[in-house]
């Protein structure tokens, strides 16, 4: 139900009921609590060709926001906190930024940040072009038409299949902006050798790994994966108001 449809002064949509934790442990609400977003309008609501439920909601507190499969991905009001911390986490370990690979990140925020940081060439591997299209339409402040920039090359489809064709030691930076559930941890673990192969010596890999406050075991798994594969790992965090928690980014240097 939308706020504008009733006389009551406040109404909420996108109820995340986490009382049954076993079934809803992939959504970031504290155990036993309900999380609400005030919705002014629903701008998009459809299932993409690759099977993702995509929604663009205009939130009262956070502006236009992307939801995929009923989970908030990005809100225009505080997206810059996420993307800037993400990219700077890798740059802290090594400032080299000739080229980068982005795995996922369909909203375009990480791509925009790489452009703003002065990367010369960016290969953006994204599964679902409809996510990119709908974000360019409604969340233009986030991506800032990144796909139209000369420094960006978009590669559509399964990223891990695509990188099999990439030459060794290509990228200074790899940013893994996938979902933060167990499936994506397993997917990254399965393909970590391929990611390491295309990363330059002394290049850095950074992944968004979720919230250490909400899912400490999940973050630990990411850190262990990076440490096992690269011999080192570091962790950065930033509070994201629309997520209602701190968010973490794990990085490793390819020594």
In which residue ranges do the predicted regions lie?
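The AdoMet/dcAdoMet-binding core of the Class I SAM-like
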Residues: 2-27, 74-224, 229, 243-245, ...
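Residue-level signature for short turns and capping positions that connect secondary-structure elements
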Residues: 61, 71-73
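Conserved S-adenosyl-L-methionine
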Residues: 230-241
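C-terminal lobe and adjacent flexible extensions of AdoMet/dcAdoMet transferase-like proteins
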Residues: 253-255
């Amino acid at each position: 139900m939308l706020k504008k449809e009733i006389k009551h002064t406040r109404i909420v949509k996108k109820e995340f009921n986490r009382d049954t934790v076993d079934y809803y442990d992939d959504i970031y609400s504290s155990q036993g609590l309900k999380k609400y977003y005030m919705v002014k309008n629903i701008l998009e609501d459809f299932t993409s060709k690759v099977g993702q439920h995509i929604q663009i909601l205009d939130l009262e507190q956070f502006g236009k926001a992307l939801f995929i499969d009923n989970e908030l991905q990005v809100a225009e009001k505080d997206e810059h906190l996420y993307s800037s911390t993400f990219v700077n986490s890798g740059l802290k370990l090594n400032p080299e930024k000739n080229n980068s690979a982005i795995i996922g990140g369909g909203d375009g925020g990480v791509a925009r940040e790489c452009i703003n940081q002065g990367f010369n060439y960016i290969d953006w591997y994204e599964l679902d072009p409809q996510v990119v299209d709908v974000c360019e339409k409604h969340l233009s402040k986030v991506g800032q038409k990144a796909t139209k920039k000369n420094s960006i090359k978009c590669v559509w489809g399964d990223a891990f299949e695509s990188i099999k064709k990439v030459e060794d030691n290509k990228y200074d930076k790899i940013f893994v902006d996938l979902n933060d559930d167990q499936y994506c941890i397993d997917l990254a673990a399965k393909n970590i050798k391929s990611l390491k192969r295309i990363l330059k010596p002394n290049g850095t890999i950074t992944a968004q790994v979720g919230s250490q406050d909400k899912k400490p075991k999940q973050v630990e798994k990411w850190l262990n994966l990076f440490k096992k594969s690269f011999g080192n790992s570091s962790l950065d965090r930033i509070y994201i108001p629309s997520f209602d928690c701190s968010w973490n980014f794990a990085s490793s240097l390819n020594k």
